[in-house]
UniProtKB/Swiss-Prot annotation:
Subunit structure: The 4 large subunits of the cytochrome b6-f complex are cytochrome b6, subunit IV (17 kDa polypeptide, PetD), cytochrome f and the Rieske protein, while the 4 small subunits are PetG, PetL, PetM and PetN. The complex functions as a dimer.
GO annotation, biological process: photosynthesis
Species the sequence originates in: Prochlorococcus marinus (strain MIT 9301)
Location in or out of the cell: Cellular thylakoid membrane
Protein name: Cytochrome b6-f complex subunit 7
Purpose: Component of the cytochrome b6-f complex, which mediates electron transfer between photosystem II (PSII) and photosystem I (PSI), cyclic electron flow around PSI, and state transitions.
Encoding gene per record: petM
Mode of membrane association: Single-pass membrane protein
Length: 32
């Protein structure tokens, strides 16, 4: 159970920054 929670948390730690950076880049390119 704990390992499953840890793996899910790791996925979020990786995906959230990628999503934030990707969203910021999209807004930046659309702004141009």
């Amino acid at each position: 159970m704990a390992q499953e929670i840890f793996s899910i948390a790791a996925v979020f730690w990786i995906l959230i920054p990628i999503g934030l950076v990707g969203g910021a880049l999209l807004l930046k390119f659309q702004g141009d």
